[in-house]
């Protein structure tokens, strides 16, 4: 199988690529390296630095396919996004522009050859989608996938991730996960509330 992974140098993308390579699949990664890291790159995967939200990304995707002699990817895992709620509140334009346009460009690319797309949604979409720009963009991405599936019969799958943690997660900077730096959590409420966590490995 020939797979394309967007956000392949990030936390979830790195773990996915490791699994795909282990199973013997061919993998190409696209990442703008805004949060993805070069040290996450895996032997056996081809990495391309590309801003999927830019107008030129569709032409770049076509060029990558030609260079690698790929007439059609078997599946595209669209993980790339400006993640986290607080940064999206601080810079809404950046999150809105990047997350929405990159999803549109991926869907336009695959519309030509009906490639299945797996979209990385967010559990935050279960709540108030207008609570913050990040949640809105992830919900919007789901709706775009549904639109292209309905109008163009494009095979799409939406995965809503819940509080992910594991190998290759961000452990530095202002917005790293609490688990990543092993900070003790202060439990609030009646101490009977639960939080769903998803291990990525």
What are these regions (language model features)?
Residues 1-164:
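N-terminal Rossmann-like NAD(P)+-binding domain of SDR-like oxidoreductases, especially those catalyzing
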Residues 133-135, 139, 143-201:
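NAD(P)-dependent short-chain dehydrogenase/reductase
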């Amino acid at each position: 199988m020939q797979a394309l992974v967007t956000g392949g140098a990030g936390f979830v993308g790195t773990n996915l690529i490791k699994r795909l390579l282990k199973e013997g699949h061919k993998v190409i990664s696209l990442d703008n390296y805004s949060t993805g890291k070069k040290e996450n790159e895996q032997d056996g995967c081809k990495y391309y630095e590309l801003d999927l939200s830019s107008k030129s990304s569709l032409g770049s995707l076509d060029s990558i396919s030609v260079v690698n002699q790929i007439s059609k990817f078997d599946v595209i895992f669209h993980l790339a996004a400006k993640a986290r709620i607080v940064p999206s509140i601080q810079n809404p334009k950046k999150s809105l522009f990047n997350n929405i346009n990159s999803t549109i460009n991926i869907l336009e690319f695959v519309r030509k050859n009906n490639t299945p797309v797996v979209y990385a949604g967010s559990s935050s979409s279960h709540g108030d989608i207008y609570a913050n720009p990040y949640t809105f963009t992830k919900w919007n991405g789901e709706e775009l996938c549904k639109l292209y599936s309905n109008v163009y019969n494009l095979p799409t799958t939406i995965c809503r991730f819940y509080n992910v943690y594991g190998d290759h997660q961000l452990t530095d900077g202002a917005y790293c996960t609490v688990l990543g730096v092993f900070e003790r959590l202060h439990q609030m409420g009646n101490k009977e509330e639960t939080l769903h966590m998803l291990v990525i490995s």
